[in-house]
Amino acid sequence: MFLPSTTNHSSAPLQKHLCLFCTFWALLFGSHGDNSVQEDFAESMLLFFADAEGYFAACTTDTTMNSSLSEPLYVPVKFHDLPSEKPESTNIDTEKTPKKSRVRFSNIMEIRQLPSSHALEAKLSRMSYPVKEQESILKTVGKLTATQVAKISFFFCFVWFLANLSYQEALSDTQVAIVNILSSTSGLFTLILAAVFPSNSGDRFTLSKLLAVILSIGGVVLVNLSGSEKSAGRNTIGSIWSLAGAMLYAVYIVMIKRKVDREDKLDIPMFFGFVGLFNLLLLWPGFFLLHYTGFEDFEFPNKVVLMCIIINGLIGTVLSEFLWLWGCFLTSSLIGTLALSLTIPLSIIADMCMQKVQFSWLFFAGAIPVFFSFFIVTLLCHYNNWDPVMVGIRRIFAFICRKHRIQRVPEDSEQCESLISMHSVSQEDGAS
């Protein structure tokens, strides 16, 4: 980085050179002109360069430049383009040829450094530190502040609360199997919303992703049919609550990924901390509203219920939501949504291992598509929205609609005609 020096020099050497310069031009014009012209020219030149000297002196003593730049460092220059020493045979020839005048440069260069606050990009591009330190600086620069995280949490706390409320209300009104089946449609809502409001290139809608989501929903249906118990208390309101919860979960994950594009920009524990704080401050009047309207009686829980609430809140809400949101940022919103459907066959497998519960073949027929669809979507997102189903359909369509080539049929001997050669015709004409 070559910058001019900003140190204050005395003006005497500059004035001396200016006087010599003006005298030279005066003598030059003196041989062809009048002495008055010489004196006027010398005075005008002195005034011009005096003003220029004052201008450059003001620029070099600029306080802003001195405050932003570091102290000058003088380093000797190494000219790499100098010709190497030639052999003795060539020296004899060069002595005979006259030497040409060369432009000479200073052997010392002045280097000054900008502070990191003024040139962060330049510092990052020229860093010689380990990669970890560079990543930490990038994360610090691009991280959202506490105020920005609080604004995002304030918007999403209501969506998060309504999604959990819908799911719990569906469990209280409908069978668990119906709730799980309808909640698995969250993957379909996520696929559609992510295509309408994409956060990155991995949210593009493809036919392969749609078939994978349908495969996951079909697997969840078979799994729940294998362990469902027939009961007459099916309620349509519970199904509506399940669909509402699935849609709200899709809105929640798609919109938060659109607001925050990278996982290192958002402090996830701070985000959920603000969500819990806003729910505590804004939604506590709902206890008295539900109590006095008669929808639900408000009573303080006993020790067992309170312990279950605390454990469920720490593991089932805080830890699971944290890991789930982090995984959605690292992969995609669709992968995170389909991962929730894996809890159904995994919980049934845990019952089989711990409580020795027996299930029919429908469970195994439904668990395989659920796992298979999850890995299919993972591969499709990994390979840059690869759509093998659409590629296969296009190839089949091109094969069916291709133009048939006209093949030549072997001709019969009766359809062949021997043409008279020109040589025989010329001989007959000569004989005649």
Curated annotation (Swiss-Prot):
Location(s), subcellular? Membrane
Where's it mainly located? membrane
Q: Which residues form the signal peptide?
A: 1-33
Which stretches are transmembrane? 152-172, 177-197, 205-225, 236-256, 270-290, 304-324, 329-349, 361-381
How does the entry describe its membrane topology?
Multi-pass membrane protein
Keyword line: Membrane, Phosphoprotein, Signal, Transmembrane, Transmembrane helix, Transport
Sites of the modification Phosphoserine? 116
Query: What's any one GO cellular component for it?
Result: membrane
Positions of the EamA domain: 161-225
**Which family is it part of?**
Belongs to the SLC35F solute transporter family.
Q: What does this protein do, in the record's words?
A: Putative solute transporter.
Q: What is this protein called?
A: Solute carrier family 35 member F5
- Originating species: Macaca fascicularis
